[in-house]
């Protein structure tokens, strides 16, 4: 087998492959053994007629299709491996020469990772981003902790706004029970707008043990079309009324919800966690700004299949999340009134940016000879094993060579990100002109 490569622009290649006649003959024989049973030849049982008789009766090309597929599947992966091309698309194949006793020649046109010259990536100048910790953030976290540790206390009085009521209910439209429109011991927070408009308001003033019929109208845009705009009657019984009591913010509260002895220690811990989160956000935004500046000085002709593959990744991620909530991707598209094409289009700009940044980082890693060390790989495997609650050795058993390479690539990209950040000129807004080196 021989092949030659012709580069087409910065992101395409045409590979011409010549395969020896014996290989194509091997494919013809395999095609014959696979398909002989489908041909009828007088005097022979299905599958027993000689190949030469079938070819004479149906034409020499009768076994070509499967033979061609066999030769392509046998030779194309080897060509890509030997050529060292970084192919990012399926090949468009054109058969140049085919026939018994002849060498088999084909051309494969493919998209490859684009060739490009890097713009300036060291000493990129950006403005420092900072997000100081606001006391409002600390107070918000404390309130969240109070909510999580709230007590629900029964009260002997009529229902008020904000109460948590336990109810039995059964809904009817035109005198017929609503499918899925009933429940027992259902907890509802009055004022949460969980139910149909008007339902919760009519519970206000009811007492424990009281029963009542509530009249409501389903919204015109209700998710179940058969109920949209319909008047409904709900038979409701209030079984319990509770109020939410939030704990006092004091040292006892801090002891109950954390390992700290005082409220001030808890606040300090919350403040530090917020600071870490804010610092990470600021760093991520500065890295994004550095990559944007590098991209402005770097021209890359990104192959369309790379963008489409990235969009596929985003859409598949959405579909997986929807599945978790019991909804299909198709039903979701119907609910939001978009076609697959329209939905995919909203990810295009994000996908282009992600692919572009990865290409830039890969190139920087190559130029700067950034590698993933065995120690770094082991550390990442330990992190993944902990995340999946596995022993490291068990995780390794499950990972293929491709999986390991993918993990290494992730380490290299992260090191390339660290490299451009550490080599940037970060200027404080308070001191324009004064470089804040990392």
From Swiss-Prot:
Keywords: Cell cycle, Cell division, Chaperone, Cytoplasm, Isomerase, Rotamase. Pfam families: FKBP_C, Trigger_C, Trigger_N. Its EC number is 5.2.1.8. It is found in: Cytoplasm. Gene3D superfamilies: 3.10.50.40, Trigger factor ribosome-binding domain (3.30.70.1050), Trigger factor, C-terminal domain (1.10.3120.10). NCBIfam families: tig. HAMAP family: Trigger_factor_Tig. Consists of 3 domains; the N-terminus binds the ribosome, the middle domain has PPIase activity, while the C-terminus has intrinsic chaperone activity on its own. This is Trigger factor. It comes from Caldicellulosiruptor bescii (strain ATCC BAA-1888 / DSM 6725 / KCTC 15123 / Z-1320) (Anaerocellum thermophilum). The lineage of its organism: Bacteria, Bacillati, Bacillota, Bacillota incertae sedis, Caldicellulosiruptorales.
